[in-house]
């Protein structure tokens, strides 16, 4: 039976040139502005949690706060891009569309100028209404999820505006490292694939890092990525998982800096070992160490102009 997974959203932002030295690009290609902001998005109510079908009750408090963070970039021609990272399972289409409309009207930000990236933590709230759990026919979980989604939209709208308001001259640099805790989770067996560690399967353990420095040379923001499920935990408490701990460690090492985590293509990769807070912290420390390694080497200067693209596609699949 053929189905369509409609409106898969993607935003692609890329820089047209990486230069090893400033002499490789004209001065206006290096005339960046950047602004960064952060806000707590931890639910205040005991909402149901997203990610694991076996859960049978709402969250029972928090282990860590959940955050949304925004990095606004502007090149010499005035082209803007706002990167928003979220400690959430994903980004519902309705949330994306509502923010597009509001940011377009208030901030003159086009759809291709807004990049939303969720860490895919399985210890965050379930606010996707079409996936909300049912409690013996009681619609309260759905209504609570809708209310959280409305609150979240408002906070993200303000967050984006704050990052844009903080735009000031900046310098961008790229470097990378590796972290080894992600492992392929598709284990072939005589009966088909099962969700288990597969050390022989394909894996992406790269850690790309974008550093943002002010005119004074001080580090203002660090954007780093990793392709791995945020599934170190399966508790009934809010937790940003290894990605959240990694951001905390980086920010502690660089006071005044905002660290942003971007999830890569980690659908077939899990963190191993897992199941405890200590393991999530261990993976977070490993990822933070990789970021520090990348920051310790001379970066490639990132030059403009800035280009981005946005589109929606239909994906055919059979079941």
What are these language model-derived features?
Residues 1-4:
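N-terminal secretory signal peptides that target proteins for export/translocation
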Residues 6-19:
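Bacterial N-terminal signal peptides
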Residues 18-26:
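Sec/Tat signal peptide C-region and signal peptidase I cleavage site
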Residues 25-258, 262-282, 295, 302-319:
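Conserved beta-alpha junction segments in alpha/beta enzyme cores
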Residues 287:
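Anionic-ligand-binding alpha/beta catalytic cores of soluble enzymes and soluble regulatory domains
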